[in-house]
Design a protein with these regions (language model features):
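Bacterial Sec-dependent N-terminal signal peptides
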Residues: 1-23, 355
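Subset of outer-membrane beta-barrel
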Residues: 19-453
């Protein structure tokens, strides 16, 4: 398990994997395929009759423990994760928007898009449990004991999958002052790989062994109970601490469907511009099924009754989910396995709401809200985040600059900067807070698309 935490910590050194992907550019005044990824109804508002997307990607990491000051001061990141109060949350993910095309025809807009997704999350992980199982130490009382009554389901999970999307948008209503569009995207899902370790209703006592012998000084767990879920498939079964574990299995076989539904309203301004645009969309309604030879989802009961004890240090250095499962099985404390060879995983369904207001000529301000629709605690749920942002932007036709200021439920307040030059864009949701404050998020996104006619 130590390898898993080390890779998450090391990712914080570079701008990597985000949940609020392409913040600022998805509500650009130059409407294109990226806008439709936020809300499919935007396809009817395409700036050009045809648009081709070559490739775009967004990478970010958000956490609630490690700040840039910890890196600058040379702190031990692995220890810093677990040495403070409150559960640990990490969110590491990447979006790859692969080649796609969109076009307008009469009052319709259409698009065919492809995308790949990589996501790793640590959800509500108790720091005492992490310090014991991952570092082989006690968090608070090095020579005493730590009792854990933790009801929440704490998880370490990772997933990769690909998408092929077919989108359509239509003008529903228009008069002299108002216009309304509606749209839908149907997505074919290609699940790549998945891994999950969940421990719900965890209760137990961690103690430093003071009895002389080969286990002297090691951490032991006693009087413990928990509901354990262990699931794995594909390349993430043996390890999810290497980049190749994800990229080698980004697209699997077709085995799922999902949908995005959206609507937008515009209060017309002069020419083709608007005074106000309001949009709403529900994204990622659906699930995908993982199946294969090396494919399992197992629910266990962990029971350690007095005077039995589990030597926790045996788990330090575990490389992957199967390795962790085997160590638990070797201990003899896992009971009543409920096994599935095929299992469904729910996509991170979210509600997107936004309003773009024209302040003066060339200056707009966008308000954006992302609200997750499902709890992250379920073992079959790919995680998401609640986000609110305010983005002032200057639009000069060929050139656009914007400043996204957001609040993220994991990493807190962030401020970034981005620009668009024709079809090329580059930005970050957190670059300003990264260089001026103790930010707990780092990210980067870029891409290129072009339109004609």
């Amino acid at each position: 398990m130590k390898k898993i935490t080390l890779i998450l910590c090391s990712l914080f050194f570079i701008p990597t994997f985000a949940q609020d992907h392409f913040s600022g550019i998805t509500t650009s005044k130059r409407v294109g395929i990226l806008n439709a990824s936020l809300n499919p109804s935007e396809l009817s508002n395409l700036d050009s009759k045809f648009e081709v997307q070559l490739m775009s990607f967004s990478l970010n990491v958000a956490n609630n423990k490690i700040g840039f000051s910890d890196i600058a001061n040379g702190n031990n990141l692995e220890n810093r994760v677990f040495d403070s109060a409150g559960p640990v949350s990490f969110n590491v993910d990447a979006d790859f928007l692969l080649p796609g095309v969109a076009f307008k025809l009469l009052n319709w807009g259409f698009a065919v898009t492809t995308a790949g997704h990589i996501k790793t999350s640590v959800v509500d992980f108790d720091p005492n449990v992490g310090e014991a199982f991952i570092n082989g130490a006690l968090n608070s009382i090095s020579s005493g004991s730590t009792k854990i009554p933790y009801i929440n389901n704490q998880r370490i999970t990772a997933a990769t999958w690909g998408e092929l999307g077919f989108s359509a948008s239509h003008k529903i209503f228009e008069n002299e002052k108002n216009i309304i569009h509606g749209g839908v995207t149907l997505k074919l899902l290609f699940p790549g790989s998945y891994a999950n370790i969940g421990a719900g209703n965890f209760q137990g006592t961690f103690t430093t062994n003071t009895t002389s012998g080969p286990d002297f000084g090691k951490i032991i767990l006693s009087n413990a109970n928990a509901d354990i879920n262990i699931a794995y498939t594909g390349g993430l079964a043996n390890s999810f601490s290497n980049t190749s574990d994800y990229t080698n299995s980004l697209f699997g076989n077709l085995n799922g469907m999902a949908a995005d539904l959206g609507i937008n309203y515009q209060l017309k301004g002069a020419g083709k511009s608007y005074k106000l645009k309001i949009g709403a969309a529900v994204k990622n309604i659906g699930s995908m099924t993982f199946k294969g030879d090396d494919n399992y989802s197992k629910n266990y009961k962990l029971e350690i009754k007095d005077p039995e004890q589990l030597i926790v240090n045996e788990f330090v250095g575990a490389s992957g989910v199967k390795d962790i499962e085997q160590k638990f099985l070797n201990s003899g404390f896992l009971y009543n396995p409920e096994t599935k060879k095929e299992f469904k995983v729910k996509l991170p369904t979210v509600l997107n709401l936004y309003a773009d207001v024209k302040v003066i000529s060339k200056l707009n301000v966008t308000l954006y809200l992302q609200q997750k629709m499902n709890a992250d605690s379920a073992n079959d749920q790919i995680t998401s985040q609640n986000i609110f942002s305010v983005t002032p932007r200057v639009s000069l036709g060929f050139f656009e600059a914007y400043l996204p200021i957001g609040v993220n439920e994991i990493s807190g307040t962030t401020a970034g900067l981005g620009f668009r030059l024709g079809g090329f864009f580059l930005g970050s949701n957190s670059i300003l807070t990264a260089v001026t404050n103790d930010s707990k998020q780092a990210d980067f996104y870029t891409g290129f698309r072009f339109g004609f006619l």
